[in-house]
Every structure is written in structure tokens, then in C-alpha cells.
Design a protein with these regions (language model features):
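Membrane-proximal alpha-helical signals and transmembrane carboxylates
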Residues: 7-10, 15-392
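Positively charged n-region of N-terminal signal peptides that target proteins for export
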Residues: 1-7
Length: 392
């Protein structure tokens, strides 16, 4: 028995040495796709009608249908700068009847294997949302594709998504770095809430609605953040501007710093908020939700105001009170707009109730939109100006 074991050891060692990776691809034979831009194809209207009719079609007619135009952007690693760690962008644009079809057509046009494990940016053309049946197929593919990076950032773009991939930013080598950095900077002042694929899937499954950042392209080179789109059933219901997004993130308690402004005696005064403490008290009485927001902030005054001489002055208290009233009014208008007009829970109130008040959630979950619309919501805002800046 011992001799048999001794004889088996060399065989096992040889088998380990002969083991290899059967599907390995050299790194210089890969195209690391960083940006995926999806536009409508010339035949998308016909494709949408076929989906709605639920008719069976021949394979030949499917193959001829250019439903989508997809652009894959990737860095040119042949000319990568070793010091900067970056390279200029290359792209491949193909048309097809589905995301799978465009992928295989892109492979046929490329001498390299497309790799999606490091993808950073997904650009969805605004026109796609005019065809929710097609967009649903696109998103189903994206959600299920195992090779796609789950932290890829998602955005909606006005105009052709392909045009954004071709932009050469002044401050970055690649468009994916530029837009993701732009969203990162904007999130610091509360004007945008970056959304990656994982967060998008969670929003859709939890609320059947989502919000995505919206960008526009001016003069073929100037990319601007214009706000956020509210999406339900793969259709854009409305848009939220930067100020509304700031208020949403304050009410969510999901913001680090931001800026608010008022006008006092002809002077514009900026209040740079450094800290936000948000509390939401939730109660359920007489078959009705009762919600109370308490928002406490600390920050610094910016801009010119001649009478702001000391933190103890009555003028500072007046300014604080004016900001309290202004912000409370903005918050109330936003809440009424989102629950009565949009009928979408963009404030994630349902998430708070589900996580921390399960008993209340069981009472309202079957009729959540109506329960939110009928809820009594009150708001209290307390601003604390800690600093008025330097003066001579």
C-alpha cells in the first residue's frame, strides 16, 4: 500500500505541472472596454412595433434589423504613457438587432478580444427611452451579463451617445475618466447622485423607479451636467434640476456638503453647508403615515454682506432664519412635486420604513404610492452659521 502511494506522488506532481489555462488570452490581445455608448438604430421603430405585436418573425428579418447602434470605447494600450498610466481612446461602432448581436459584430471588426471587467461608463441615449420595450431588452442583457463590471457608472445623454465617446477632454485623456470625475466633483456639492449598475438594479427592484444623471454636449466638445432623470417602466417621467437634486440628497441624508443661497437687502448670500444631520421620525396613526423631517446644518457664509460683523450679531440670526424658511419652502415643494406629480419615491422614504419600521411597512406596502401621497409630512430646518469668513 505504501509503495502504491509513493508511485502515485510523481504522477500527481506531473499532472499539476501539465495543467494550464485553456482559455487564456495575452493581455496585448485584449481591448479593455472602458465606455459603452448605446444609441437607437435606424430600424428601432419597426423593432418596437414587432415587440408590441408579439408576432413571430423569421431569422432573416431579425438579422436585417438594426435596432441598436453600440459604440465600444477602449484605451489604445499600444501607445500607453508609462508615467501617466493613460492612453488615448479608440472606439468601434456597430449596428445590430440586440446587444449580443452588436457584441459579436464588434468582435468581427476587432483584432482583439473585448474585455468588460474594467468598464467604467455606460452612456444611454435619451432617445432609447422613447422605446421602452427595446430598452427593457437592453437593460436585461446588461443586468445579466456576468463579464460586465457591476460598478460601471450609468448616465443618460442628450443627442447621440457615440458623439460623447469621440470627445477629447482638455483635462483627461479619456471620456470615461472625465465624466466619472465630473460626477464625483458634482456629488460633493450635492448636484448629482452618481448611480452604478448595482445601485440601479437595487432601485428598480425595490421601487420600480430610478434616477440617472443627464448630460448634454454643447459645441461638440463641452459636456455639461444638466440634472437627473426620473425613470419608471423604462420611460423618463420628468427631470430634476441641480437644485432639486441637492434638496433630495439633503432629505435623504446622503450628502456631505452643498451650497444654498438667498437674497437679503439686495445682496446675494451663499451658505456653504459643511455638515448635514438629517432625522426622519416615522409614525402611523388612524391609517395614515405621519413623517417629520428635522434637518440640522452647520456651515459658513460666503459672499458679501456688510452687516455680518460677528457670529453673535442679530444679523446672523436673521440670516439663519431666512435660510431656515427658504430651505423649508424648497423641501416642501419638492416633496409635494415628487409624490403628487411624479408619484415616485425619489426620497427613499419606503426604504427607511422597510428597514426600521417593519410593522408600519406591513400596513402600507400593498398600497405604497397612495399611502405616500396621503401622508402628513412636516419639516423643521435649523441652520447654524459657524463662520462668516475673514475680514480686514
Amino acid at each position: 500500500m505504501k509503495n502504491k502511494i509513493i508511485k502515485l506522488i510523481p504522477i500527481m506532481m506531473i499532472s499539476l505541472l501539465l495543467t494550464g489555462c485553456w482559455d487564456s488570452v495575452e493581455i496585448d490581445r485584449k481591448a479593455f472596454v472602458s465606455t459603452i455608448a448605446i444609441d437607437v438604430g435606424e430600424d428601432i421603430k419597426a423593432r418596437s412595433e414587432i415587440i408590441n405585436s408579439k408576432e413571430n418573425t423569421s431569422e432573416e428579418s431579425i438579422e436585417k434589423n438594426n435596432t441598436l447602434r453600440v459604440t465600444y470605447g477602449f484605451p489604445d494600450i499600444r501607445n500607453m504613457d508609462a508615467k501617466k498610466g493613460t492612453a488615448s481612446e479608440l472606439s468601434i461602432t456597430v449596428e445590430g438587432y440586440s446587444m449580443t448581436d452588436t457584441y459579436f459584430k464588434a468582435l468581427a471588426k476587432s483584432s482583439r478580444t473585448l474585455h468588460f471587467g474594467h468598464s467604467k461608463l455606460l452612456l444611454l441615449s435619451e432617445d432609447l427611452f422613447k422605446y421602452p420595450e427595446v430598452l427593457q431588452e437592453v437593460m436585461d442583457y446588461i443586468e445579466r451579463e456576468p463579464s460586465l463590471n457591476r460598478t460601471i457608472m450609468m448616465t443618460i445623454v442628450k443627442g447621440r451617445a457615440k458623439d460623447y465617446v469621440e470627445v477629447k477632454p482638455v483635462t483627461e485623456e479619456n471620456i470615461d475618466n472625465y465624466i466619472t470625475s465630473l460626477m464625483g466633483n458634482s456629488s460633493k456639492n450635492g448636484t448629482v447622485a452618481p448611480v452604478n449598475l448595482t445601485k440601479y438594479i437595487d432601485m428598480v427592484k425595490s421601487y420600480k423607479a430610478s434616477v440617472l444623471p443627464v448630460f448634454s454636449l454643447e459645441n461638440e466638445k463641452d459636456i455639461q451636467l444638466t440634472g437627473m432623470a426620473v425613470i419608471e417602466d423604462f420611460t423618463i417621467k420628468d427631470y430634476l434640476d441641480n437644485n432639486q437634486m441637492t434638496d433630495i440628497q439633503i432629505l435623504r441624508g446622503d450628502i456631505g456638503s452643498c451650497r444654498k443661497a438667498i437674497n437679503k437687502e439686495g445682496h446675494n448670500i451663499d451658505y456653504y453647508i459643511k455638515n448635514v444631520d438629517r432625522d426622519l421620525h416615522i409614525d402611523y396613526e388612524d391609517n395614515k403615515l405621519k413623517l417629520k423631517y428635522t434637518i440640522d446644518t452647520e456651515g459658513t457664509l460666503k459672499g458679501y454682506y456688510a452687516k455680518a460683523e460677528s457670529l453673535d450679531s442679530e444679523v446672523i440670526k436673521e440670516i439663519e432664519q431666512q435660510f431656515n424658511e427658504s430651505m423649508k419652502k424648497d423641501f416642501q415643494e419638492l416633496i409635494d412635486f415628487t409624490r403628487n406629480n411624479l408619484k415616485v419615491d425619489v426620497l427613499d422614504i419606503g426604504s427607511d420604513i422597510r428597514r426600521f419600521h417593519k410593522g408600519i411597512w406591513n400596513e402600507v406596502k400593498d398600497n405604497w404610492p397612495q399611502a405616500l401621497e396621503n401622508a402628513e409630512i412636516s419639516i423643521e430646518v435649523n441652520n447654524d452659521i459657524r463662520n462668516i469668513g475673514l475680514s480686514n
